[in-house]
Amino acid sequence: MCIRDSENAKSTRAFLKRVSESHPLVAPLAEQKITELPRHVHKKGDHQSGFDGKPLLVAALKGHDIGLISEAGMPAVADPGSSVVRAAHDLGLTVIPLVGPVSLLLALAASGLNGQNFAFVGYLPQDAGERSARLKQLESLAHKTGQTQLWIETPYRNAAMLSGLLQSLQGGTRLAIASGLTLPSARIQSHTVAQWKKGLQGPDGHTPAVYAIGP
């Protein structure tokens, strides 16, 4: 038996079905138990929700393997799952991260920004005023310390994010935007804000994007 904790059970089943066509599953898909993490964990983040992941690990304590799957990112990094991982450590279970692309590091590597000192700050505020204040704070930190600041945004807010960036940041600040990473349609652009203001096109409203700024 295999148990998988997921962000969305429906898409997880579809993914496993597709994978099984070339890599047979250890157990038939019909026999696999897929449990969704609670919605409030998605919204608040595992570290703030007070969610106890131990009940999801009962089968692991009995010797069964458990997989943690998220929608479009790396589980427990900008996606739900850290509470389950933490609970596994607390219970003495072995945690094994699997090799795979992580958009944050791919975007950083392709940005031309400082890859020795960087910080991922999650999502920025949705309110325009609060977002502008946060952007200026991150820009100041980047220029003072040389630390690259990275964040992500929901695709349908990409246009608002780019508009806010161009309104809030100094012309000499470098802004990198990477969208659709690992896809044939991937776009990675890294220019000063002044160059972006000349009419460079940002990501569309349907594609996940990673944003990064630095000196």
Q: What role is predicted for each listed range?
A:
Residues 22-24, 111-116, 137, 168, ...:
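Short, hinge-like loop/turn segments at secondary-structure boundaries
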Residues 74, 78-141:
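Class I SAM-dependent methyltransferase SAM-binding "motif I" and its flanking Rossmann-like core
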Residues 40-47, 126-129, 183-186:
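A short acidic, often aromatic-flanked loop/helix-cap motif at beta-alpha or helix-coil junctions
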Residues 4-96:
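Class I S-adenosyl-L-methionine
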Residues 70, 95-100, 151, 177:
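General beta-strand structural signal in soluble alpha/beta enzymes
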Residues 9-10, 82, 101-102, 155-159:
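Alpha-helix N-cap/helix-start capping motif
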Residues 44-57, 134-139, 187-197:
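Short, surface-exposed amphipathic charged segments that create phosphate/polyanion-binding patches used
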Residues 33, 64-65, 143-215:
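A contiguous loop/helix-start segment that scaffolds small-molecule binding in enzyme catalytic cores
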